[in-house]
Amino acid sequence: MSDTPQSPAQDSLAEHDEARPMRTVKSFVMRAGRMTEGQQRGLDLGWPKFGLELSDEVQDFDAIFGRQAPRTFEIGFGMGHSTLEMAAAAPDLDFIGVEVHKPGVGALLNGLLTQGLGNVRVYSCDALEVLRHCVADASLDRLLLFFPDPWHKKRHHKRRIVQPEFAELVRRKLKVGGVLHMATDWEPYAEHMLDVMSAAPGYRNQAEDGRFVPRPQERPVTKFERRGERLGHGVWDLKFERVD
C-alpha cells in the first residue's frame, strides 16, 4: 500500500508468446530513492529482526512469528504507514508485507522498531515469487493489494498485476473463506479488477450489488486518499472471498 498514486507494484507475471521464448513482464518499476536517517536505521537494525529472504522452500510462518495467528499478506506497502496502523490496531494478527522500494522498506522497519511491534515480517523482492515459493497453499486469511500501479496506457495494461494468473495464484494461497481485498483510485483499473475477478473461478464477490464494497473500516485512509477526496476523486474497494 502506498501514499502515492503509483506505488511500485510488487510482483511479476509471465506471458507466453508462441513465436518467442517465455519472458517475464514486471508490474513494478525499481525507482531509486535517497534514504533518510530513520529509513537507514530501519534497514540496519530492523532487517535482522523482521526481514525475510526469498527462499525456494515453503516457510514455516508459525515458527517465524512464534505463534499461530490469522495471517495477512500485503503486496506493495509503500512507505508502510497503513501497515503500521493495521498491525498496531490488530496485535492478534500477523502481517507479511512485501515492497521493492528500499526507502519504503526502511521506513516500515523503522516504524516497527519505534512502535515496538512484533507482528510484522518484511520481504523486499518480487511478491509473486514469495507467494509461489514461500507461502503454503491454503494458508492465508487475507491478501491486500492497495493502490497498485494502474499502468494507464493501453500498451502497458499487460503490466497490471491483476490478471487471471494472479487471481488463480492468490486463490491457491488463501484459505477457503479467505479474502482478497483490493483498492484503487483509478476507475478504469477498478473495472479491470472487477472483470478479472468476476471471471476467476473459486471466488465470491462480497459486494451486495456484485461490484464494489463500501470502504472497509479496517483499511486505513492514506494521505494521498484524503487529498483525493478533497479534490472529488473516488476510491474503489473490491473484496473477493475464496469459496472453492
Swiss-Prot record:
Keywords: Methyltransferase, S-adenosyl-L-methionine, Transferase, tRNA processing
Binding site for S-adenosyl-L-methionine: E74, E99, D126, D149
Gene: trmB
Listed Pfam families: Methyltransf_4 (PF02390)
EC top class, as a word: transferase
UniProt function note: Catalyzes the formation of N(7)-methylguanine at position 46 (m7G46) in tRNA.
Pathway in which the depicted protein is active: tRNA modification; N(7)-methylguanine-tRNA biosynthesis
Catalyzed reactions per annotation: guanosine(46) in tRNA + S-adenosyl-L-methionine = N(7)-methylguanosine(46) in tRNA + S-adenosyl-L-homocysteine
Active-site residue list: D149
Recorded family membership: Belongs to the class I-like SAM-binding methyltransferase superfamily. TrmB family.
Polar residues compositional bias, start-end: 1-10
Gene Ontology MF, one: tRNA (guanine(46)-N7)-methyltransferase activity
Top-level lineage group: Bacteria
EC number(s) recorded for this UniProt protein: 2.1.1.33
Gene3D superfamilies, alphabetized: Vaccinia Virus protein VP39
InterPro entries assigned to the protein according to its UniProt record, in alphabetical order: SAM-dependent_MTases_sf, tRNA_(Gua-N-7)_MeTrfase_Trmb, tRNA_methyltr_TrmB_bact
SUPFAM superfamilies, per the entry: S-adenosyl-L-methionine-dependent methyltransferases
Name of this protein: tRNA (guanine-N(7)-)-methyltransferase
Residues reported to bind substrate: K153, D185, T222, K223, F224, E225
Source lineage: Bacteria, Pseudomonadati, Pseudomonadota, Gammaproteobacteria, Pseudomonadales
